C-alpha cells in the first residue's frame, strides 16, 4: 500500500485539519519544516519521506474561490506533483483546470468531492472535459453519513453512490469521513472500504482520516485499500520514514 501525504491549504498556509471544522483550523506545527508555508511543508515531505506526489485540498477554492495557480506552481517546484482538490464541481471549472494545466503538467489527478457536486449529472459533465483516468472521486462522509445536502445523493447511500461513479468510468475512489480527520483515533470506514473492494477489484481504493499508527495502515491494507491519505501523523513524528519503510509502506 502506498502513502500519499496531504496538505490542507487555507489562505497562504498549510493548516491542521481537525474533524472537518474548517473555521477552527490553525497553521500546522510540523517537525518537517520551520514554518507552515506550502513550499516548506512540501519540501519537508520530499526531504524526509522521498515523496513525489501530494494531495492538496485548497479549502478556499473548495469554498468557492478561484484556484491559486501561483501557489500550486510553487508547491510543484519542490518536486511534487499534485492530486488537486479545488472544488471541481462543474464542466466550466473542469475546462478551466484543463486549460490551465495543458502546457504545465503539475497536476497528477483532479479530485471531484461528493460534498461539492449537486448531482451525478454534474460528474458526467466534468467527464466530458476530463478523462476519467485523471479523475478521483472522493466519497465524503461525516459521522458515517453522506456529506451532501442534496436529496439525490442522500437517497442513494454510500454504496449506491460508489456504484454510480464506477459506472461512469471513474476508477479511483477516496473514502473519507471528515469527522475523523486529524483526530488520530483510527479509520472508521473499514467496513465500507471492504464492501467497496468486494464490489469491484477494478478501482483504486483510497482511504484516510484518523490514521495515526502502523496498525491503522495494516487494517486498511487488509480490507483492500491501495493508498492511504495521511497528514497529522507525518507532521508530529508518529509515523516516520523509517517506521513506514520497515513495515513495507511506500510513497509514490
PLM regions and their residue ranges:
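Catalytic cores of alpha/beta
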Residues: 81-106, 119, 125, 191-227
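Short, acidic/polar
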Residues: 33-47, 91-96, 153-164, 217
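N-terminal beta-alpha supersecondary unit
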Residues: 14, 18-61
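C-terminal helical cap(s) of enzyme catalytic domains, especially alpha/beta-barrels
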Residues: 123-127, 221-223, 227-252
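Conserved anion-binding
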Residues: 10-29, 95-181
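Short, small-residue-enriched loops and turns at beta-alpha junctions
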Residues: 60-65, 90-91, 144-146, 179-186, ...
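Hydrophobic faces of well-ordered beta-strands that scaffold small-molecule active sites
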Residues: 2-10, 54-56, 82-86, 110-112, ...
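N-terminal active-site wall of soluble small-molecule enzyme domains
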Residues: 45-101, 189-193
Amino acid at each position: 500500500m502506498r502513502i500519499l501525504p496531504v496538505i490542507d491549504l487555507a489562505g497562504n498556509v498549510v493548516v491542521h485539519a481537525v474533524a472537518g471544522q474548517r473555521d477552527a483550523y490553525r497553521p500546522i506545527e510540523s517537525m518537517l519544516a520551520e514554518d507552515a508555508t506550502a513550499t516548506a511543508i512540501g519540501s519537508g515531505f520530499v526531504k524526509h519521506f522521498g515523496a513525489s506526489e501530494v494531495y492538496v485540498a485548497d479549502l478556499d477554492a473548495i469554498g468557492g474561490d478561484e484556484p491559486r495557480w501561483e501557489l500550486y506552481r510553487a508547491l510543484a517546484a519542490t518536486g511534487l506533483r499534485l492530486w488537486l482538490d479545488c472544488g471541481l464541481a462543474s464542466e466550466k471549472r473542469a475546462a478551466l483546470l484543463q486549460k490551465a494545466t495543458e502546457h504545465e503538467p503539475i497536476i497528477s489527478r483532479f479530485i471531484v468531492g461528493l460534498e461539492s457536486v449537486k448531482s451525478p449529472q454534474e460528474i458526467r459533465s466534468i467527464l466530458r472535459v476530463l478523462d476519467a483516468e485523471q479523475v478521483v472521486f472522493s466519497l465524503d462522509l461525516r459521522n458515517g453519513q453522506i456529506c451532501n445536502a442534496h436529496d439525490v445523493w442522500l437517497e442513494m447511500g454510500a454504496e449506491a453512490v460508489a456504484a454510480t461513479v464506477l459506472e461512469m468510468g471513474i476508477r479511483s475512489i477516496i473514502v473519507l469521513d471528515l469527522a475523523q480527520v486529524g483526530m488520530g483515533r483510527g479509520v472508521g470506514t473499514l467496513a465500507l472500504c471492504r464492501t467497496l473492494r468486494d464490489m469491484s477489484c477494478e478501482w483504486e481504493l483510497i482511504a484516510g482520516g484518523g490514521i495515526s499508527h502502523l496498525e491503522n495502515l495494516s487494517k486498511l491494507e487488509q480490507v483492500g485499500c491501495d493508498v492511504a491519505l495521511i497528514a497529522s501523523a507525518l507532521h508530529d513524528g508518529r509515523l516516520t520514514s523509517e517506521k513506514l519503510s520497515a513495515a513495507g509502506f511506500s510513497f509514490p
